[in-house]
């Protein structure tokens, strides 16, 4: 981001792209369902990293572009887990759970709070795959927990951001917060 913002004339770029997935470990991503508290904790910790990433990228962008002519596009975000073992090899499919709803809500809150710079954000894939809003099986279709979070957040579209803050206790697991 620093190199782009420092060296590329603003009229040559509309935005800087950022990708971030809530991944436990890129080697063993963990299950999409039937996960334990440790996996849930690590997934949520990875999801909350979006706040840090957007804040740091925005600070660099503000340094070179205080008029906010260049946007931050979060091209891909969401939970990413290992493919279900019963699914054919080479096909990426993952079940969606309440953990994914929490990841979606946490991430959408970050985007709302940074709406002055984040002008576009795309869930990775919308149907059957990462952070899906719809799951299909032949002629059947279900709306996922992520879908319902998206539906709840649609009232934020073209709305006025009211800054709020709160204090809470940290959620910790062992020595990790």
Predicted regions span which residues?
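Conserved hydrophobic residues forming the short capping helix/wall of the S-adenosyl-L-methionine
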Residues: 61
């Amino acid at each position: 981001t620093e190199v782009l913002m420092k060296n590329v004339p603003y009229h040559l770029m509309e935005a800087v792209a950022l990708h971030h997935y809530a991944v436990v470990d890129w080697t063993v991503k963990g299950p999409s369902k039937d996960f334990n508290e440790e996996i849930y904790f690590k997934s949520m910790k990875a999801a909350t990293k979006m706040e840090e990433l957007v804040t740091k990228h925005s600070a660099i962008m503000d340094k070179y572009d205080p008029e906010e002519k260049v946007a931050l596009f979060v091209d891909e975000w969401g939970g990413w887990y290992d493919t279900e073992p019963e699914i054919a090899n080479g096909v990426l499919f993952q079940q969606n759970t309440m953990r994914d709803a929490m990841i979606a809500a946490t991430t959408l809150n970050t985007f709302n709070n940074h709406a002055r710079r984040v002008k576009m954000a795309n869930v990775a894939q919308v149907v059957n795959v990462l952070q899906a809003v719809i799951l299909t099986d032949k002629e059947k279709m279900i709306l996922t927990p992520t879908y319902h979070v998206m539906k709840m957040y649609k009232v934020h579209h073209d709305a006025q951001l009211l800054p709020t803050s709160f204090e809470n206790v940290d959620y910790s697991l062992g020595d990790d917060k």
